[in-house]
UniProtKB/Swiss-Prot annotation:
Keyword entries, A-Z: Cleavage on pair of basic residues, Disulfide bond, Ion channel impairing toxin, Nematocyst, Neurotoxin, Secreted, Signal, Toxin, Voltage-gated sodium channel impairing toxin
Key word Disulfide bond present: yes
Name this protein carries in UniProt: Delta-thalatoxin-Hhe1a
Chief localization: secreted
General function of this protein: Binds specifically to the voltage-gated sodium channel (Nav) and delays its inactivation.
Family, as annotated: Belongs to the sea anemone sodium channel inhibitory toxin family. Type II subfamily.
Species assigned in the record: Heterodactyla hemprichii
Length: 84
């Protein structure tokens, strides 16, 4: 009986987590406002006068974005949308 309760609780947790996920839409990036700005390599030498054109992404850059700085580690990358 305890095994059935554990399985039932695990299934309910999986259902709750999957119901909270938002659909992945390429034209709508909700998390942009929550990102932190960062300085790309070509923004200029001084951080105070440079325009911060990149955003910090944990892990690696999102699909369709490019890594624009070489000074971030495996934990985070400075990324931006490719310039046309």
């Amino acid at each position: 009986m305890a095994y059935q309760k554990i399985v039932f609780v695990a299934l309910m947790l999986v259902l709750a987590v999957s119901a909270m996920r938002l659909p992945d839409q390429q034209d709508q990036d909700i998390s942009v406002a929550k990102r932190v700005a960062c300085k790309c390599d070509d923004d200029g030498p001084d951080i105070r006068s440079a325009t911060l054109t990149g955003t910090v992404d944990l892990g690696s850059c999102n699909e369709g974005w490019e890594k624009c700085a070489s000074y971030y580690t495996v934990v985070a990358d400075c990324c931006r949308r490719p310039r046309s």
